[in-house]
């Protein structure tokens, strides 16, 4: 069996393969964060195409989300998310719980304890909607991502300095304590911002350990931060940094990085760089990518024998 299509245990959940739909920002939600038929249809297409795990687009944990952003900040939104879960069935869904980024001046003094409760309540709603688990979003352009970064977090209280990941860990711990062991709790973290004043790999090694100790049984590792995110020049360009985190933790790790080629994805998994591969553009362009990837692996193109050039094949000028 190809590793890309082998099952994997994520705590209490076993997924059928290693293909994950990267959380898209579809902008298809209605005002107030409600789902729409177009939103449900997109998840239904990805599930039918054969992905092993679906990550929702970011779901706001607090009221008044940005226009087009889905939400999970109120009990009335449980039924909305349940429509997405039903559309994707039987493919498991993880709800990506997110707090949008805050203005930098506000970030330095805003109270953070209420945000922990907002995440925990949103996680409860996700489970009530039928989700297999949640992903706590610490990616760039999020409040938790800001707090984890030294370039944006200059707080001098218990959430600054060496404790920049405290809120993210407190959120994971609160969800685990409240909802118990039968829920997948993932944590998304920026492993390196690729800039001198940003998050570094050495810091992220510590953060990864802290998140797992708090109760995370899945890590979603991303590299770079807006607006310094480099343009990917080759498949799997993020994998060396992802592998550095995977070697330190005992939970599965998701990798991103323009991995739209099935053979390259299979090779990365076999090398141990990651446990799951997240796809964004390939699935947006072709929801049936998993099916075609399996066909590609089963029927690799024939090797072409190299022909040694002879003098007669060279241009006459030579």
Question: How would you label these PLM feature ranges?
Answer:
Residues 1-318:
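Flavin-dependent oxidoreductase catalytic cores
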């Amino acid at each position: 069996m190809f590793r890309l299509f082998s099952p994997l245990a994520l705590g209490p959940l076993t997924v059928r393969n290693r293909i994950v739909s990267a959380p898209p920002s579809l902008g298809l939600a209605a005002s107030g964060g409600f789902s729409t038929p177009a939103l449900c249809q997109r998840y239904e297409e990805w599930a039918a195409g054969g992905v092993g795990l679906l990550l929702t687009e970011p779901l706001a944990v607090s009221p008044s989300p940005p226009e087009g952003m889905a939400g999970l900040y109120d009990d009335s939104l449980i039924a909305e998310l349940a429509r997405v879960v039903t559309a994707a069935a039987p493919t498991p869904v993880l709800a990506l719980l997110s707090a949008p980024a805050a203005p930098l001046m506000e970030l330095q003094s805003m109270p953070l304890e209420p945000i922990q409760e907002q995440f925990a309540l949103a996680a409860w709603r996700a489970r009530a909607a039928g989700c297999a688990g949640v992903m706590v979003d610490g990616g760039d352009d999020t409040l938790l991502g800001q707090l984890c970064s030294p370039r944006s977090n200059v707080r001098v209280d218990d959430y600054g300095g060496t404790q920049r990941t405290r809120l993210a860990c407190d959120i994971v711990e609160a969800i685990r304590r409240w909802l118990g062991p039968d829920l997948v709790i993932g944590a998304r973290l920026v492993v390196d911002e690729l800039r001198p004043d940003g998050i570094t790999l050495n810091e992220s090694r510590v953060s990864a350990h802290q998140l797992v100790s708090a109760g995370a049984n899945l890590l979603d590792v991303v590299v770079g931060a807006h607006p310094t995110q480099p343009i990917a020049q080759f498949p799997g360009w993020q994998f060396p940094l992802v592998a550095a985190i995977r070697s330190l933790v005992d939970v599965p790790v998701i990798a991103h990085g323009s991995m739209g080629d099935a053979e390259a994805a299979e090779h990365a998994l076999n090398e141990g760089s990651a446990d799951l591969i997240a796809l964004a553009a390939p699935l947006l362009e072709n929801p049936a990518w998993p099916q075609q990837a399996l066909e590609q692996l089963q029927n690799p193109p024939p090797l072409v024998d190299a022909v040694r050039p002879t003098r007669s094949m060279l241009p006459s000028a030579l």
